[in-house]
């Protein structure tokens, strides 16, 4: 009987952790907004930050970068299986939107040399930022990864997507969001 209770307790704890760490894709969408895009009036200001590029050591100032083009911030880690599965899709999108949308990986768990090595081994060419203090990840509410945050040129968070669903086409869904954002920004004087 004691053994059964212990086994049941272990299973419950394992299930709780599985629920906590299993990434379920979700996107916060306002009524009437384009798919995956929070309406501009309902969008919150993005948390400003400065992080070092893991490859060059140069600082990236988020607000200054966002003024140049919309940003996709991908919070990830090398040990995260769903993150690793999502990164090739983000690489393809970074090439598709080159010059129109800037993509940045934000890594909170690896050293810059490990981030550089991982990027090189996996053919990732978009900049990877080092957030070893977890300050930026926490300020964006990254309680699970991967977490994608789309920031418009006004510095507002327009889309937040948590997790990775291998059955969902990331490239298609994020493309729809980015296309809607770019179309909206073309209309704005």
How should these model regions be labeled?
Residues 117-125, 131-182:
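Thiol/disulfide oxidoreductase modules built on the thioredoxin-like
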Residues 1-52, 173, 189:
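N-terminal targeting signals for export/organelle localization
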Residues 72-73, 103, 148:
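Hydrophobic beta-strand anchors of alpha/beta hydrolase catalytic cores
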Residues 84-122, 132-139, 176:
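Structural microenvironment flanking redox-active thiols in thiol-disulfide oxidoreductases
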Residues 44-46, 67-68, 98, 143:
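Extracytoplasmic
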Residues 69-71, 75-79, 144:
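Short pre-active-site segment immediately N-terminal to redox-active cysteine/selenocysteine motifs
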Residues 69, 100, 125-126:
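A generic structural signal for alpha->beta connector loops
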Residues 48-71:
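A short beta-strand-turn-helix
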């Amino acid at each position: 009987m004691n053994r059964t209770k212990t086994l049941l307790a272990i299973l419950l704890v394992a299930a709780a952790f599985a629920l906590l760490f299993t990434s379920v894709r979700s996107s916060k969408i306002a009524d009437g907004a384009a798919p995956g895009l929070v309406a501009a009036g309902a969008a919150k200001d993005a948390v400003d930050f400065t992080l070092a590029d893991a490859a060059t050591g140069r600082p990236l100032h988020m607000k200054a970068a966002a003024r140049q083009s919309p940003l996709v911030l991908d919070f990830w880690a090398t040990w995260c299986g769903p993150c690793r599965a999502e990164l090739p899709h983000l690489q393809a999108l970074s090439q598709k939107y080159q010059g129109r949308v800037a993509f940045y990986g934000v890594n909170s768990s690896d050293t810059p040399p490990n981030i550089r090595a991982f990027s090189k081994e996996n053919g990732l060419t978009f900049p990877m930022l080092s957030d070893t203090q977890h300050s930026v990840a926490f300020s964006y509410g990254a309680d699970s990864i991967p977490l994608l945050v789309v920031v418009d040129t006004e510095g507002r968070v327009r889309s937040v997507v948590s997790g990775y669903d291998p059955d969902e086409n990331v490239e298609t869904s994020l493309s729809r969001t980015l296309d809607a954002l770019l179309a909206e920004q073309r209309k704005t004087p």
